[in-house]
Amino acid sequence: MMKVAADDTELIKVELIEPQAALYNVAAPYNLTIGAQGSGKSHNIGIGSGFFVEYCPNVIGIIAANTYDQLSRATLKETFGTWKEIFGWTEYNAKANPGGFFVIDKEPPAHFKNHGHTFKSNNNNIYFANGAVVFVASLENYTVIEGVEVGWGMLDETADTREEALTSVITGRLRQKGLCAAKEPIDGIFPYCPSDHPAAGKPVNPLFVFTKPA
């Protein structure tokens, strides 16, 4: 069990099975989780990406899946549900949900913290109220990822992904500076931190791969 500080006043208990919890025991550049359908892989993407957004908002992340259908209908659907359940984050809407924490494919509202980046387009970008940015992508069209730099990545259902997409494109994009292994887990739960954090250790750009058995 992990306790997540969703804000300054509330602690939320998160139940993780052992393979899920193992991802947060140590900071590592490559992290592989193999599980059958329904084993909680996408749920763990929601938890892990939420931690990076919460603790390392200045570092851009990427969430990708093998196909666009997989990305939109499963990976992101589960991720958004996990963000709401664990962190209390929902999509911002000026009229329907003015207290929302993120926007998708659109310019963030003025009250969101400035993320400090210049992007040609807002397509496939998720912007958060604390200034964090996460790209989303389909690995069936992996060449569109070329040219971007990210600090961490989470890939879902990669069993059928072309090897070049992983070895040449994704790993080559993991080079944004600003993310380090934490000498001591932040809040006792998260082994990564910004490079300017007092607990910052060696620089790292972690890649998390979640896939089914071959």
Features from the language model and the residues they span:
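Phosphate/NTP-binding elements of NTP-utilizing enzymes
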Residues: 1-214
